[in-house]
């Protein structure tokens, strides 16, 4: 049986039943695995709690390593690492920032894998990522997965905010605004989105 790690334990540990899994399989606690975390920053927010205090309190493992950090962040990466430590208290944790551009995000994915991370997680979206082909971030993910790593992105953060439908061509090429109104019986090629009264949305 493994007790909770540190002063505070994430509710997610119980919600996903990883606490029950550790009880049922006490020899499996993440030992021998390094988890790589990508987010904004790890130890630069200026808050009273720091990486050092988190390690002292048992909220992070002593084996925590920071490959690169980002000045002025919220230390969300450290919060993610605390959750990882609750779920897999035996795992080592490694952090690299994803907040200095697409290329550096991609490079840090590879850097984490090269440094030994076998499980890598991120919670970062760039609106400029390509939608219909693999950009540098996706290519880096493909590379580390091909090398044996497992990669998880926080798709659940925006999982209900997408739109999926069968593609219908507009029949035009290139820039085609303003869009003409559809005639009766035409196959719709614009997205049928309905907003409730008083609702707002950001379309990207």
Region locations from a protein language model:
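Substrate-binding/specificity loop regions of serine endopeptidase catalytic domains
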Residues: 126-204
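Proline-centered loop/turn at the N-terminus of a beta-strand
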Residues: 34, 92, 148-150
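Subtilisin-like peptidase catalytic core
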Residues: 40-45, 55-128
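Extracellular/periplasmic catalytic domains that process cell-envelope and extracellular macromolecules
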Residues: 26-31, 86-88, 112-114, 144-146
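Autoinhibitory propeptides
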Residues: 1-24, 109-111, 115-116, 123-142, ...
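Acidic-leg catalytic submotif of subtilisin-like serine proteases
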Residues: 13-68, 153-156, 201-204
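Short acidic, glycine/serine/threonine-rich loops at helix termini
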Residues: 46-51, 105-108, 132-134, 162-167
């Amino acid at each position: 049986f493994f007790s909770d790690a540190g002063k505070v334990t994430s509710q997610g540990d119980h919600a996903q039943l990883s606490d029950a899994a550790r009880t049922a399989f006490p020899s499996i606690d993440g030992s021998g695995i390094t988890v790589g975390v990508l987010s904004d920053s790890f130890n630069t927010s200026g808050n009273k709690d720091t990486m050092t205090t988190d390690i002292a309190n048992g909220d992070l493992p002593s084996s925590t390593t920071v490959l690169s950090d980002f000045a002025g962040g919220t230390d969300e990466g450290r919060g993610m690492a605390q959750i990882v430590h609750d779920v897999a208290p035996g795992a080592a944790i490694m952090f690299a920032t994803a907040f200095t551009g697409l290329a550096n995000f991609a490079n840090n994915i590879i850097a984490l894998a090269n440094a030994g991370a076998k499980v890598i997680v991120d919670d970062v979206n760039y609106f400029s990522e390509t939608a219909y082909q693999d950009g540098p971030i996706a290519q880096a993910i493909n590379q580390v997965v091909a090398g044996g790593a497992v990669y998880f992105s926080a798709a659940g953060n925006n999982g209900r905010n997408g739109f999926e439908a069968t593609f219908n061509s507009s029949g035009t090429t290139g820039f085609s605004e303003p869009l003409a109104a559809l005639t009766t019986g035409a196959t719709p090629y614009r997205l049928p989105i309905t907003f409730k009264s008083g609702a707002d949305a950001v379309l990207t």
